[in-house]
Amino acid sequence: MATPDAGRQGSGRWVVVLPLEPLRAGDVFSVGQWPLHVTLVEPFTTAIDADALGAALEPLAASTAPVPVTIGPDALFGPKHDIPVSLVEDGGRLAPLRADAQDALRALAVDLRHPRTDYRPHVTAKRHGRVREGDRLTLELLTLVRLRPPETSHHGRIAGSWSLSGRAGSAP
């Protein structure tokens, strides 16, 4: 799949998320309009282009079933504990998906620096929307986001988005 960042030279900053709404390659957004999502792999910097990153992530999405989640209680994140989030109850399904995504990126020699060891899936509350405790959602997409792309003033651009369509991890 060709992406808007295909073949672009130099380092790029990226993040891998599970969006709550459909996102397509090429979609852009500002800081204030970040689509609601669960971060799967924290931001990382690499000179590897979007096509190679996507080629590593796409098979993972294809082999992973959609992930049903329930929104749990609210919490405050960040160094000052001033960022409102809603915790995500996932029945333990996101940690292996996260590890597999990290492994796929590391196989390309992507340096993930210091991934969090205390991963707590959550959705950050935004002015334009939020989730509520008790909401039941199904995470159906794995999405690669280019942060602060150099040719635009937007905060992010969707470099690739793949359906979670596999049977892996599905209940018997």
Give, region by region, the residue ranges found by the protein language model.
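Basic, often amphipathic N-terminal segments
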Residues: 1-70, 76, 90-143, 153-158, ...
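Short, basic/glycine-rich phosphate-binding loops at helix/coil junctions
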Residues: 75-85
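Short, conserved, GDST-rich strand-edge loop motifs in beta-rich repeat architectures
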Residues: 145-147
